[in-house]
């Protein structure tokens, strides 16, 4: 299978890249359930004969409406007549599951050489597409890379300071940059090694938004930070079981 790199990298100098790797599982679709409403209406002037309204089906938009209706068994009990068909349990709600988006997250790293803050959000639109938003604010020297990876991605350091994706677990995803902005300059502040002095350091701000399709089942954020005095690798994954009716069983 072809090697895919979809990792976006925030460099203090202002370069941005995006690569996504994933597994070929997609979020399960949902269908609108249907139910039949059967009503019986007695004919008052003809004894021992009853007429029935023809059954009709309509989509159920919200299963909570069923709580406002009396069960068919109780309705027939009040009228003193038996029901025509056995009662069936109501189908589950047809609400669209948005299991891919899991809200805001941030990473704040402070070292002698760099002060870094990264914020982001992943939004599932419920139609097979999702948006990725990132912002980064850095003062000093260092590199930060942020990737969208599957849960099977190992957390480890790389000598080349890049994130490589195994070919067997890769798949091509459609992503395009919607918006990007980079600002660079110099900022003066108290020196970390000597607070009595004032130092001038590089300052960079950047933000970007991507629109992607064909997401994998569970997405994790993978952060790798490298500087002259510190390095960090971290993977953050959402609680998939909280968003889905079916449990998630990781593989790989």
Swiss-Prot record:
<dbReference type="GO" id="GO:0007218">
    <property type="term" value="P:neuropeptide signaling pathway"/>
</dbReference>
<feature type="glycosylation site" description="N-linked (GlcNAc...) asparagine">
    <location>
        <position position="127"/>
    </location>
</feature>
<keyword id="KW-0325">Glycoprotein</keyword>
<feature type="region of interest" description="Disordered">
    <location>
        <begin position="27"/>
        <end position="58"/>
    </location>
</feature>
<feature type="compositionally biased region" description="Basic residues">
    <location>
        <begin position="45"/>
        <end position="55"/>
    </location>
</feature>
<feature type="region of interest" description="IV (linker domain)">
    <location>
        <begin position="158"/>
        <end position="166"/>
    </location>
</feature>
<feature type="glycosylation site" description="N-linked (GlcNAc...) asparagine">
    <location>
        <position position="137"/>
    </location>
</feature>
<feature type="region of interest" description="II">
    <location>
        <begin position="23"/>
        <end position="75"/>
    </location>
</feature>
<feature type="region of interest" description="V (Cys-rich)">
    <location>
        <begin position="167"/>
        <end position="252"/>
    </location>
</feature>
<dbReference type="GO" id="GO:0005576">
    <property type="term" value="C:extracellular region"/>
</dbReference>
<dbReference type="Pfam" id="PF06312">
    <property type="entry name" value="Neurexophilin"/>
</dbReference>
<dbReference type="GO" id="GO:0005102">
    <property type="term" value="F:signaling receptor binding"/>
</dbReference>
<protein>
    <recommendedName>
        <fullName>Neurexophilin-3</fullName>
    </recommendedName>
</protein>
<dbReference type="InterPro" id="IPR026845">
    <property type="entry name" value="NXPH/NXPE"/>
</dbReference>
<dbReference type="InterPro" id="IPR010450">
    <property type="entry name" value="Nxph"/>
</dbReference>
<keyword id="KW-0732">Signal</keyword>
<feature type="signal peptide">
    <location>
        <begin position="1"/>
        <end position="22"/>
    </location>
</feature>
<feature type="region of interest" description="III">
    <location>
        <begin position="76"/>
        <end position="157"/>
    </location>
</feature>
<comment type="similarity">
    <text>Belongs to the neurexophilin family.</text>
</comment>
<feature type="glycosylation site" description="N-linked (GlcNAc...) asparagine">
    <location>
        <position position="143"/>
    </location>
</feature>
<feature type="glycosylation site" description="N-linked (GlcNAc...) asparagine">
    <location>
        <position position="62"/>
    </location>
</feature>
<keyword id="KW-0964">Secreted</keyword>
<comment type="function">
    <text>May be signaling molecules that resemble neuropeptides. Ligand for alpha-neurexins.</text>
</comment>
